[in-house]
């Protein structure tokens, strides 16, 4: 399966990385590297991740990583990563 990063995810991740890098650019780079590596594991068994608490669709799942929730959609041949949430009621807050 191919992983597609939607603009909503990329923008939110970049914003969070900017915030982390204020304190430590090295930690920001490590956070990004570790997160991308975890996301790359999704295609091996995407349904092992919990059903999203933000959506009622069985194909939308949540990957919890260091207090953040990465929301992704499982399609036939792709995984669409579109949400990056921390302490929000909705992934679009």
Feature annotation, model-predicted:
Residues 2-60:
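Basic, Lys/Arg-enriched alpha-helical interface segments
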Residues 1-2, 93:
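Absolute protein N-terminus
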Residues 65-69, 73-93:
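Enriched for short, Lys/Arg-rich terminal
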């Amino acid at each position: 399966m191919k992983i597609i990063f939607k603009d909503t995810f990329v923008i939110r991740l970049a914003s969070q990385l900017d915030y982390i890098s204020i304190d430590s650019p090295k930690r920001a780079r490590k956070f990004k590297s570790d997160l991308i590596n975890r996301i790359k594991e999704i295609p091996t068994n995407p349904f092992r991740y919990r059903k999203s608490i933000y959506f009622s669709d069985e194909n939308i799942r949540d990957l919890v990583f260091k207090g953040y929730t990465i929301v992704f959609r499982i399609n036939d041949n792709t995984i669409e990563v579109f949400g990056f949430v921390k302490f929000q009621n909705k992934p679009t807050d």
